[in-house]
Regions:
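Charged, glycine-rich active-site and insertion segments that engage polyanionic ligands
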Residues: 6-9, 15-122, 127-129, 133-204
Length: 204
C-alpha cells in the first residue's frame, strides 16, 4: 500500500473499516458496496449450485446479502435453527425452558459439534439483531414472528444498549466455556437463562 507499482489497482475488502489502522485508511479511497438484493443473492446462490427456495428472504435477512454466509447457512440448516431459537426467545421473559433444554441437548456429543457451533453463532446473532432493532436499524425480518419479538423485547435505545452489553458478555462467556470444555447442553441452557433474565430486567 505504501509504494504500489505504477498502474496497479489494489482492492482491499473490509467488512469493518473502522477497525483498520489509520495508516491504512489514509492510503485508501472508500467504495461502499450495498448488500445484494434478494434477487441477486438468489442468482449468486444458484450459480454456486445452492437452491434457496422459500428460504431466500430469510437467508437475505440473516446474511444481509452475503452469498457466502447464505450458502453456509443453507448447508448447515441455519434458517430452521434460527427460527427455533427465535421461537424460544419469543416467550421471554418466562421462556419455555423445556424447549430451550431440548435444543441444548441437541448440541451434545461429537456428532453434534456442527450443531453446537451453529446454535452458539445464531444465538449471538439473535441478540445482536435485538440490539440493532432497538437502536433503530432498518432490519429485514425472517418472519412476522421475529419482527414482533424484536419489537417487544427491544423497543428503544435503552433496551438496545442492554442487549448489546449482553451479547458482548455472552460471546466471551461462550468462548471461555468452549475453551475449558464445559458441557455444551449446560452452556447453551445457561445462555438462554441469561437472555431470559435480561428480558425480565428490561420488562421492569
Amino acid at each position: 500500500l505504501e509504494e504500489p507499482p505504477a498502474r496497479v489497482l489494489i482492492l482491499l475488502i473490509c467488512h469493518q473499516p473502522a477497525r483498520l489502522l489509520p495508516t491504512i485508511r489514509s492510503r485508501c479511497r472508500v467504495l461502499r458496496c450495498q448488500p445484494l438484493s434478494d434477487e441477486d443473492l438468489g442468482r449468486a446462490l444458484g450459480a454456486a449450485g445452492v437452491e434457496a427456495g422459500d428460504d431466500l428472504p430469510a437467508l437475505a435477512a440473516l446474511c444481509e446479502g452475503s452469498a457466502g454466509e447464505a450458502a453456509r447457512l443453507m448447508a448447515s440448516g441455519g434458517v430452521p435453527l434460527y427460527r427455533s431459537i427465535m421461537s424460544i426467545l419469543s416467550g421471554a421473559p418466562g421462556l419455555d425452558r423445556a424447549a430451550a433444554s431440548q435444543l441444548a441437548n441437541a448440541c451434545t456429543g461429537a456428532a453434534n459439534a456442527d450443531t453446537y457451533d451453529n446454535v452458539i453463532r445464531l444465538i449471538l446473532l439473535a441478540i445482536t439483531r435485538l440490539a440493532r432493532a432497538g437502536a433503530g436499524a432498518a432490519l429485514n425480518v425472517v418472519n412476522v414472528a421475529e419482527g414482533e419479538t424484536l419489537a417487544r423485547l427491544s423497543p428503544n435505545p435503552t433496551t438496545a444498549r442492554g442487549w448489546a452489553d449482553l451479547a458482548q458478555m455472552l460471546d466471551a462467556r461462550l468462548a471461555h466455556g468452549r475453551a475449558v470444555n464445559l458441557d455444551p447442553s449446560q452452556l447453551i441452557l445457561d445462555t438462554f437463562l441469561h437472555i431470559d433474565a435480561e428480558a425480565r430486567r428490561r420488562a421492569g
